[in-house]
């Protein structure tokens, strides 16, 4: 089942070129189905790129999903047209009374700043707290995972001596969890970050469950509240060329950057990337939507406020 998207969202035409079926809200309204309502708090600089990456994965589910995009109030995007933000994004004030089956909070390029020094930290904390009474299950990605773990559980982040950059092998620690249905014992995920969270801090907190980690990239997936929250440090949603674009961007800016590990064929940046995370990325988002959103959310969406932890 395709996603229900606002008409003229750029991702629609981009994904049609990849033969991915999406429909606009007018056509979707003719189907007598209660769609899943998912909101994306998009903190990434390249909004349209991130929208497309997420829509690509969410559209692979047999479930109909209606997607909203949220932005931080008063925060102007420097890399996305103002007209796009006005047409497709809502401030938190406009949706704070709404309920959602799922929420995705993206990363943000602020990881080397103390959480309390991020200009929108207070609003973000409010959104995090709101999600616990208004959302069935939330995915926190990359910096958002660090921010969520810090806000709810006091988990610190640590600076890395150099950027963690590349595609790394990960292991499944609890293969019986529904989030891992269909996963191989080892799988690959892109990472692009300057900071990390550490295993020893996670395991000290009884409310947290470490689900997956990497020998090279460290903690990857942490779960809380039985699956009502997932904290994911990598970027399984990345398109094939995202790390390449980041690499050449930093090269052109004269910034120190290593070749992304396990990414370019023969480690040659003039050759195309070797994509080996696409299958597990699709499984991750499909499993989340099916087992932790669709199967747990109430039919009357306002009953989300009465949900407890997922057993």
Show where each model-derived region lies.
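N-terminal beta-loop-helix "entrance" segment that forms/cooperates
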Residues: 73-86
């Amino acid at each position: 089942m395709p996603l229900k998207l606002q008409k003229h969202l750029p991702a629609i035409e981009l994904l049609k070129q990849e033969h991915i079926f999406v429909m606009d809200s007018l056509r979707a309204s003719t189907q007598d189905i209660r769609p899943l309502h998912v909101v994306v708090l998009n903190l990434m600089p390249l909004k349209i790129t991130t929208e497309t990456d997420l829509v690509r994965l969410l559209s692979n589910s047999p479930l109909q999903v209606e997607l909203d995009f949220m932005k931080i109030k008063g925060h102007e995007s420097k890399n996305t047209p103002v007209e796009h933000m006005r047409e497709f994004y809502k401030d938190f004030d406009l949706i704070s009374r709404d309920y959602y089956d799922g929420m995705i909070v993206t990363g943000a390029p602020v990881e080397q700043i103390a959480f309390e020094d991020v200009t929108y930290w207070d609003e973000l904390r409010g959104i995090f707290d709101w999600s616990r009474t208004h959302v069935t299950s939330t995915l926190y990605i990359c910096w958002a995972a660090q921010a969520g773990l810090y806000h709810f559980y006091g988990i610190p982040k640590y600076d890395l001596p150099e950027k963690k950059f590349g595609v790394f092998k990960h292991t499944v620690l609890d293969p019986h969890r529904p989030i891992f249905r269909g996963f191989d014992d080892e799988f690959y995920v892109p990472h692009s970050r300057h900071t990390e969270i550490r295993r020893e801090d996670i395991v000290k907190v009884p409310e947290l469950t470490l689900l997956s980690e990497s020998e090279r990239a460290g903690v990857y997936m942490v779960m809380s509240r039985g699956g009502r929250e997932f904290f994911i440090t990598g970027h399984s949603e990345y398109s094939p060329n995202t790390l390449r674009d980041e690499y050449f961007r930093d090269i052109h800016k004269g910034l120190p950057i290593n070749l992304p590990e396990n990414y370019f064929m023969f480690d040659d940046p003039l050759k195309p990337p070797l994509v080996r995370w696409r299958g597990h990325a699709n499984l991750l988002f499909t499993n989340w939507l099916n087992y932790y959103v669709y199967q747990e959310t109430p039919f009357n969406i306002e009953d989300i406020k009465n949900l407890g932890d997922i057993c």
